[in-house]
Each structure stands twice: as C-alpha cells, then as structure tokens.
C-alpha cells in the first residue's frame, strides 16, 4: 500500500491511499496514530503562534530594545 503525503501544516497528518492493483482493501482509510502524538501536537500548536514560541515574542517587546527605539 502506497501512501501519498499531503502538503499540510506539520500538526495535521493525513495519508491518502493510492490504489494499486489488488491492494485496495484499505483504500480511503486514514492511518491511526498514538494518543501521545495527538497530545504532543496540541502542545506544539498552543506554543507556536504565527511568529514562533511565546518566549521570542516576550523578548521582542520588552527590555533594552524598546528603550533604544524610544530614544
């Protein structure tokens, strides 16, 4: 059974079954993966905004950089 990987964000994992001769019993079914993996993906999604993890955002806003911009 061949699987074609779709171009989706890293946290979405969908496999499209490509039918080959004589191997079409499982066609149309997506592969199951572990619950641990799902939890990890949820955490990753929560941590990563559009511009990366929240720690980076905090360092951009506050501190010495901001005072330099004001002066």
From Swiss-Prot:
Residues 52-71 have a biased composition (Basic and acidic residues). Residues 23-71 are annotated as: Disordered. This is Uncharacterized protein F54F2.6.
């Amino acid at each position: 059974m061949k699987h074609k990987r779709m171009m989706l964000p890293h946290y979405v994992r969908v496999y499209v079954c490509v039918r080959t001769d004589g191997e079409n019993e499982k066609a149309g079914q997506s592969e199951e993966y572990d619950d641990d993996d799902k939890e990890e993906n949820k955490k990753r999604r929560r941590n990563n905004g559009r511009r990366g993890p929240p720690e980076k955002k905090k360092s951009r806003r506050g501190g010495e950089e901001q005072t330099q911009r004001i002066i």
